[in-house]
From Swiss-Prot:
SUPFAM superfamilies found in the cross-reference section: Bacterial luciferase-like (SSF51679)
Subunit structure: Homotetramer.
Biological role: Catalyzes the desulfonation of aliphatic sulfonates.
InterPro entries: Alkanesulphonate_mOase_FMN-dep (IPR019911), Luciferase-like_dom (IPR011251), Luciferase-like_sf (IPR036661), SsuD_RutA_monooxygenase (IPR050172)
Assigned EC number: 1.14.14.5
Name of one Pfam family that matches: Bac_luciferase
Keywords linked to the UniProt accession: Flavoprotein, FMN, Monooxygenase, Oxidoreductase
Molecular function terms from GO: alkanesulfonate monooxygenase activity
Protein name in the entry: Alkanesulfonate monooxygenase
Record-stated family: Belongs to the SsuD family.
Lineage: Bacteria, Pseudomonadati, Pseudomonadota, Gammaproteobacteria, Enterobacterales
Catalytic activity: an alkanesulfonate + FMNH2 + O2 = an aldehyde + FMN + sulfite + H2O + 2 H(+)
Length: 381
């Protein structure tokens, strides 16, 4: 099975070390462009663009990278409860059209009540997933070309429709990650690819089996992906030294503050990440070559595969054997590590190198009439 390898645009900051200003660098448009172009040339399928108040806006960043890349896809966040599904569907179709079919979407419900309140969202965990399920139903139906009337608990639309369809049919793929039962149920019913953070293989296997069974109950087939950091070097010793350097400027106070911030979230996935290290620096290798040091201060994906190219490739193939076909990777700093992964890891894997897409013809059309419909040629009698 050929593997889809993704990289990451660090719109929330980048540098050589975690938890310190030492070794950091400005993340401006030029730097993000360098990373995107490197990923494009090295054969990554796409890049994940993060979302949240600590990040630059993912949609604007993605749009700005379209003209400087050729085949790279952009995995951009959909935010239920923050954006209406109709507006989000229009944005999705436009990004897909402008990128010539290179748009992918990642459903993000949010997990930090404090940040969500700042965005005007006051739903609890269960309510957010209810709203996300309704949002996704409407969003997908609009991209399928339907005129949608929907009266749910959280979402209400009447006569919603798109005038401009996406390039990818029936619609651009939808990704989603969540570890709670309600999150898995949403994934099983409505998304195309379920993402998990990088837990040990036995825990990932358990998740995949649960989601696959729930999807089968809905008559739905689903793909799987995993989000991991990577520290790959020419030798295993060099890789482990690099891992230790990454957290060499971390002090106990910074770790404690970070863990306290993570504790206020209601994300089951974040709780599972934190349980892998319990905020302590000892015993960070939680599974062969799987290191939890990143999660001491970084929210979300907090584990890294560490080793030389063949070793990391063997661990990736272990995950692939569980049914995972997409790997969303990152490393610090992201420009240099994009090359290291491409040069030291890719030769040991069956990587699906994307082709440059051919321009897709768009139907000629006149200006929309009354902002309501596209004029069609009148049949001759």
């Amino acid at each position: 099975m050929s593997l889809n390898m993704f990289w990451f645009l660090p719109t929330h900051g980048d540098g050589h070390y975690l938890g310190t200003e030492e070794g950091s660098r400005p993340v401006d448009h030029g730097y993000l462009q360098q990373i995107a172009q490197a990923a494009d040339r090295l054969g990554y399928t796409g890049v994940l663009i993060p979302t949240g108040r600590s990040c630059e806006d993912a949609w604007l960043v993605a749009a700005s990278m379209i003209p400087v890349t050729q085949r790279l896809k952009f995995l951009v966040a959909l935010r239920p409860s923050v954006t209406s599904p109709t507006v989000a569907a229009r944005q999705a179709a436009t990004l897909d059209r402008l990128s010539n079919g290179r748009a992918l979407f990642n459903l993000v419900t949010g997990s930090d009540p404090q940040e969500l309140a700042g965005d005007g969202v006051f739903l609890d965990h269960s309510e957010r997933y209810e709203a996300s399920a309704e949002f996704t139903q409407v969003w997908r139906r609009l991209l399928l070309g339907e005129t949608v009337n929907f009266n749910g608990k959280h979402i209400h639309v009447r006569g919603a429709k798109l005038l401009f369809p996406p390039i990818q049919q029936p619609y651009p793929p939808l990704y989603f990650g969540g570890s709670s039962d309600v999150a898995q149920e949403l994934a099983a019913e409505q998304v195309d690819l379920y993402l998990t953070w990088g837990e040990p293989p036995e825990l990932v296997k358990e998740k995949i089996e649960q989601v696959r069974a729930k999807a089968a109950a809905h008559g739905h087939k689903i793909r799987f992906g995993i989000r991991l950091h990577v520290i790959v070097r020419e030798t295993n010793d060099e890789a482990w030294q690099a891992a230790e350097r990454l957290i060499s400027h971390l002090d106990d106070e910074t770790i404690a503050k970070a863990q306290a911030a993570f504790a206020r979230t209601d994300s089951v996935g974040q709780q599972r990440m934190a349980a892998l290290h319990n905020g302590k620096r000892d015993n960070l290798e939680i599974s062969p070559n799987l290191w939890a040091g990143v999660g001491l201060v970084r929210g979300g994906a907090g584990t890294a595969l560490v080793g030389d190219g063949p070793t990391v490739a063997a661990r990736i193939n272990e995950y692939a054997a569980l049914g995972i076909d997409s790997f969303v990777l990152s490393g610090y700093p992201h420009l240099e590590e994009a090359y290291r992964v491409g040069e030291l890891l890719f030769p040991h894997l069956d990587v699906a190198i994307p082709e440059i897409p051919q321009p897709q013809p768009l139907n000629p059309q006149g200006e929309a009439v009354a902002n309501d419909f596209i004029p069609r040629k009148v049949a001759q009698s």
